[in-house]
From Swiss-Prot:
Domain of life assignment: Bacteria
Provenance organism: Desulforamulus reducens (strain ATCC BAA-1160 / DSM 100696 / MI-1)
CDD domains in UniProt: uS7_Bacteria
Family to which the UniProt record says this protein belongs: Belongs to the universal ribosomal protein uS7 family.
One GO BP annotation of this record: translation
Name the UniProt record assigns to this protein: Small ribosomal subunit protein uS7
Length: 156
């Protein structure tokens, strides 16, 4: 293993329209085959739909949705004496955000019918209202961590 310092973390540039770094991260996660323009169009269209339907700022709604989908705890597999234990660990802030965005995009893609922008807008609005598949995924993750609380002393 190389002994040089760690690789510096590259910071994302804020989104050109909303000036938000988290919106840029959503664009990056949504992007397929390097087609940033397509991903940006989907997200901006989704934000317009949110603005029309809620009458609020789309970034406010998106931030509320992100707060509802970011996990606080998760489980990690740890091998002890030939047995694998699911050990609950706290999620770092950076990973919380990444998981929230990743799950949101995943469940947006799984939604049926309509355009991608409509599906994303619906998923964001559902998450902001504490409903939807993304919020359920977070709750399931927390339940797993709670169920395996007995193995918390195996943390490293």
């Amino acid at each position: 293993m190389p002994r040089r310092g760690g690789i510096p973390k590259r910071d994302v540039l804020p989104d050109p329209i909303y000036g938000s770094k988290i919106a840029t991260k959503l664009v990056n996660q949504m992007m397929l085959d390097g087609k940033r323009g397509v991903a940006e169009k989907i997200i901006y269209d989704a934000f317009e739909i949110i603005k029309e339907k809620t009458g609020k700022s789309p970034l406010e709604v998106f931030d509320a949705a992100m707060k509802n989908v970011m996990p606080v705890l998760e489980v990690k597999a740890r091998r002890v004496g030939g047995a694998n234990y699911q050990v609950p660990v706290e999620v770092r802030a950076e990973r919380r955000q990444t998981l929230g965005i990743r799950w949101m995009v995943l469940f947006t893609r799984k939604r049926a019918g309509k355009s991608m922008a409509e599906k994303l807008a619906a998923e964001i609005m559902d998450a902001a209202n504490n409903t939807g598949a993304t919020v359920k995924k977070r709750e399931d993750t927390h339940k797993m961590a709670e169920a395996n609380k007995a193995f918390a002393h195996y943390r490293w």
